[in-house]
Amino acid sequence: MKSKVLNYIKLARLDKPIGIYLLLWPSLLGLLLGTISEGYIDFENILIVLVGSVLVRSCGCVINDISDRNFDKVVERTKERPLASGNISLKEAWIFFIILSIASFCLLLLTPLLTLKIALFVSLLIILYPLSKRFLKAPQLILGITFGSGSVISYSLQSESFSLSIIILYFGLVAWIVSFDSFYALEDIDDDKKIGINSTPILWGGKTIFIANALHLVFYTSLLLIAYLNEFSIFFLLTMGILLILFYFQNQLAKKELYLDAFKTNNYIGLFAVLGFTAEIFFI
């Protein structure tokens, strides 16, 4: 029984929470922007965003493994995943996905109608992403659109009218997510070529790091624009300074071909962006 539970935990990647964090940070940034618009933050909305990030990321991991189960069996990094290794059957994985989806929908019933509509649309993208790797040259774009939508969903929890700031944030987040997932995909580029899976590193080739860096700087520019539009204090430049240091550190790791470590740096980038927004809104 214990080993079965552990396999379900691994199937949902709950043992590797960085994916939860990278979905959570965009969502919290959107929620914080909604707080600026409305002048308050509802504690219930924070809980919805926290729980929702766990459920949605878990759903995404399960449907991804269902879709990629035959590929995962022949890739060294993924062949021990519960579904690929046979520790969980396809039927069990589908049942688990349905349970997670129902739990996610029940959570959405606590939200405004606008939030529910946006989230249901985004749920289609969650299902589409694993398939997009087969027919889209840059599937990371679908991931960026999907993960970035967390900011819009959480913003709609706080505000029914969309501001210019949330639009800027959304496009900045899409650029950032495409950027950091391209670093992640560099780790698997040889296996992806072998099994016929598309990715931005395969599409961009030797220009991958340059383009990923350019997209990353688009994200930073979006943060500066939001700071200007919302009259953040001069202290926000301290946040941007920390983010630039992390950007430099990420590139040093990439130069050493430590792509997975470079990818993980983005967890801290998201964290400090959220802390910077929080400080400006509540304390400065």
Model-derived features: where do they sit?
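Multi-pass alpha-helical membrane architecture of UbiA-family
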Residues: 1-284
